[in-house]
Every structure is written in C-alpha cells, then in structure tokens.
Curated annotation (Swiss-Prot):
Originating species: Arabidopsis thaliana (Mouse-ear cress)
Transit peptide: 1-51
Top-rank taxon, per record: Eukaryota
Assigned keywords, A-Z: Chloroplast, Plastid, Transit peptide
Gene3D superfamilies: NAD(P)-binding Rossmann-like Domain
Subcellular location: Plastid, Chloroplast, Plastoglobule
Keyword Transit peptide: yes
Claim: Plastid is one of the keywords in the record: yes
Protein name: Uncharacterized protein At2g34460, chloroplastic
Amino acid sequence: MATSLLLRHSSAVFFSQSSFFTKNKSFRSFTSIKMEKGEAENAVKTKKVFVAGATGQTGKRIVEQLLSRGFAVKAGVRDVEKAKTSFKDDPSLQIVRADVTEGPDKLAEVIGDDSQAVICATGFRPGFDIFTPWKVDNFGTVNLVDACRKQGVEKFVLVSSILVNGAAMGQILNPAYLFLNLFGLTLVAKLQAEKYIKKSGINYTIVRPGGLKNDPPTGNVVMEPEDTLYEGSISRDLVAEVAVEALLQEESSFKVVEIVARAEAPKRSYKDLFASVKGQ
C-alpha cells in the first residue's frame, strides 16, 4: 500500500516591510503583524509567491490555496497555454513559462524581483530517460535555489518526500524506497537537492510528505523531524496546506519536516507543529 501511494508522489507574509531572512536567520511572519483584515490582504498582494511545478497535482493545489488565502501568485509552468485551462481566471494569478532544467539565469528572470517567496513542487514523470529525476529533482531544484539567491528571494519551500534518506535510516529494503529508486534513483536525487538547500544560506522549509493521496483530507497532520517516518500517507490538499503554512509560520525556518495524516492524531495548530521540530 505504501509503495503504491508513494509512487503517485510527484515532486511541488508575511509580505511586510520586514524580511523573511535576516542576518540572524530569522524572519517576521505576516501573521505576526497587527493589521485589519483588509490591510493584511492588501499587504499580501504587494508581493508574489512563485510556484514551480504549478500544474502538477500538488502544485496546482498549492496555487489554489495561496489564491484562496489572498496571496498573489506567479505560476511557473512549461506550457502556458495548457496551464491556462487548469486554473480559473484570477487577477492575482500570473502564469509564466518556467523550466527548472534550463538553468538559474533564465529562472531568475522569470521569478523576477517581485517574488518574495518560492515554493517548489516539481517532480519527474516516469519515462524512458532514466536521468530525468536528476535533471528535475536534483539539478532543477539546485537551479531554482540559485535563481532565488540571484533575486534575493527570502523564503524557499521544497516539497520532497519521506524516505529520501532511507539508506541511512536502515530502510534500504523498504519496498517503497526500492520501488521509487528504480526510476533513476529518484529519492537519492531529491536528497542531494536537499543537501544543497541546507548549505545555500536561504531561509528554507523542506516538507517531506508520505504517500500522496488525491482523496479529500482525512485525519490530522502528524509532523516529525527528518529521517523519522518510513510509512504512512497524506492528502495532497494537506500537503499544499502545510507548504503554504510554512510561509506564514516563523517556526518553520531552516527545518526539514516529515508529514503524514493519522485519524488518531490530535488536532494541533501549525505553529505548534512546526515549533515541535528542531531546526538546523
């Protein structure tokens, strides 16, 4: 079951006068600023969140949740015309062509100087090119991080996967770990990208979900430190929610979090969930 669910995984403020990322590695979240509701919404829309992999099953949900919460969004896609059929018209949504494999310079131009945060929800689709996972999940993510640094982006959120470090966890014979790595060592590629992010200096949150489900959310989010979970599943809707909350909660800074959903888990605020995980 875990194998089939993980196979479907496609790897996909606070906008105030202050910055997410400062010299002491801290940022002031949008929710910490005392504003009237209308003022807060206007403040959010002064900057954009760039979403890479915006038409993927998880990326699309991230875009929709950002828009529903009043964010302005720049959706990075490989086929703009096709993407236009995936989203409803929204004055806060800008669809732009972006291919993470084309290098950081082009990506920096697309991200622009009006994107204050970037969420990466890219992921390869199984095909004949066994190097695709490395082109997208490793080098593509690295390109995106370098582009963010060029543009001074203040927050980077990566949607990754549990079991990326399965070998070190003693899970090398885990069926899901074996199966996903059949496709060009996908999890190994993701892990290398994570290592680069940690050394980049950018304020990051790496979200590692369990097996992804397209069903409506059930249960409550369980959040654990990196290299803890080796089974379990979670709705893509909840993954998108966690990715957005990573922008809003200062407790998410410089952390790798693993998430699944469990019916028996208590309901906890995202502030508490992120605070419960030790950072870098």
